[in-house]
Amino acid sequence: MAMERTFVAIKPDGVQRGLVGEILGRFERKGFKLVGLKQVTPSRDLAGEHYGVHRERPFFAGLVDFITSGPVIAMVWEGDGVIASARKLIGATKPLDAEPGTIRGDLAVNIGRNVIHGSDGPDTAQFEINLWFSAEELNAWTPSDQSWRIES
């Protein structure tokens, strides 16, 4: 059975605040498989493509400035229902609206510094994965405990 994949990025504020391990751990404990991981300071071109849907919005320039201000941890996670589940783990875009127990609910306060990005649907996930990763950077592998996490 082919598993779904999603793109997740820990933004510069999450990296600077030392939250990478905490965030990775939440996805791993949930049972998702990490198939792509890299640290990169995005170029303005990459940021512009990533946030292209917001190009005409007044906050676009600030978004690009912020995401290019420092290192980002770009990840691809794989698992059954990973896109929707990742969105639940991440929490509402506005941290003050995010439920306690979510990444943003526990670790963020301000919408402009909300720590993490996650794809919002299958088409977006595929676009973002292809934008940030080459096929060679993604690893197909089988965790030794897979039968304990996923019913066949």
Swiss-Prot record:
GO molecular function, one term: ATP binding
Binding site for ATP: K11, F59, R87, T93, R104, N114
One biological process term in Gene Ontology: GTP biosynthetic process
Names of required cofactors: Mg(2+)
Xref: PROSITE patterns: NDPK, NDPK_LIKE
Coiled-coil residues: none
Listed SUPFAM superfamilies: Nucleoside diphosphate kinase, NDK
Reaction(s) catalysed by this chain's protein: a 2'-deoxyribonucleoside 5'-diphosphate + ATP = a 2'-deoxyribonucleoside 5'-triphosphate + ADP; a ribonucleoside 5'-diphosphate + ATP = a ribonucleoside 5'-triphosphate + ADP
Keyword Ubl conjugation: no
Keywords assigned: ATP-binding, Cytoplasm, Kinase, Magnesium, Metal-binding, Nucleotide metabolism, Nucleotide-binding, Phosphoprotein, Transferase
Pfam families per UniProt: NDK (PF00334)
Catalytic residues as annotated in Swiss-Prot or TrEMBL: H117 (pros-phosphohistidine intermediate)
The protein's Enzyme Commission number: 2.7.4.6
Signal peptide boundaries: none
Keyword Phosphoprotein: yes
Any one Gene Ontology cellular component term annotated for this protein: cytoplasm
Compartment annotation: Cytoplasm
InterPro entries attached to this UniProt entry: NDK-like_dom, NDK-like_dom_sf, Nucleoside_diP_kinase, Nucleoside_diP_kinase_AS
CDD domains (UniProt xref): NDPk_I
Family per record: Belongs to the NDK family.
Subunit record text: Homotetramer.
HAMAP family: NDP_kinase (MF_00451)
UniProt function note: Major role in the synthesis of nucleoside triphosphates other than ATP. The ATP gamma phosphate is transferred to the NDP beta phosphate via a ping-pong mechanism, using a phosphorylated active-site intermediate.
Name this polypeptide is given: Nucleoside diphosphate kinase
Gene this chain is encoded by: ndk
